[in-house]
Design a protein with these regions (language model features):
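C-terminal catalytic "cap/lid" subdomain
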Residues: 1-200
């Protein structure tokens, strides 16, 4: 698993799909002595629910009609062998249901923009997005985790463009504008609030 941009279930889906209990070691590439080990099984029920906070710059969000999204995803995974994306919560506008896909590599999307937009004439892409991901254990048991996290990020002067929390993955994704040091500010803000976030 060397070289992942962000630790996410789409990157380790074979491990998850087969129910394998395998520890994952995340290494700081600038300082390889710094590592974090993530295990599927909770070692200590009283441990902190947030295990790791990651940030990724240069992302893009695709808005596409729901009826075309499966075609696109199948094509990306099977023909392009590309899976560095996360499906965000859908929305409805003017009676049309849209899906949103967060691409973790904005440069890839720019290179393949014509191909991606070719699946739906109403599809649009927004660039310059940054994503902060909170990964942990049973975060659905944590009272006000989303509100506390978003409030702290807001206090640091950042505008949150999207928050996506999924009980099944115990993951929270926060999308902000990718400019100057926004990602670093958001991560710092969450770390400052971490001590106030506890299990119910």
């Amino acid at each position: 698993m060397f070289g992942m941009n962000i630790l996410d279930p789409v990157a380790i889906k074979e491990i998850l799909e087969n129910g394998i209990s395998l520890p994952i070691v995340v290494t700081n590439m600038r300082n390889p002595e710094k590592t974090t080990t993530i295990e599927r099984k909770t070692i200590n029920d009283n441990g902190h629910p947030i295990k790791i906070i990651t940030g990724k710059k240069n992302c893009a969000i695709l808005r596409i009609e729901d009826e075309f999204v499966h075609q696109l995803l199948n094509s990306l995974e099977n023909k392009k062998r590309y899976s560095e994306f996360v499906i965000l919560s859908p929305f409805t506008k003017d009676g049309i249901k849209f899906s949103r896909i967060l691409f973790l590599d904005g440069d890839y999307v720019k290179r393949n923009e014509k191909y991606i937009l070719g699946f739906d004439p109403l599809a649009t892409i927004t660039y310059n997005r940054g994503v902060i991901t909170l990964i942990g254990d049973e975060m659905w048991r944590v009272q006000q985790i989303v509100s506390k996290t978003s409030a702290k990020i807001g206090e640091s002067g950042l505008n949150i463009l999207n928050i996506d929390a999924q009980e099944e993955t115990s993951r929270i994704i926060v999308v902000v504008e990718d400019s100057t040091d926004n990602i670093e500010k958001a991560i710092t803000a969450i770390h400052e609030e971490r001590s106030n976030i506890k299990f119910i």
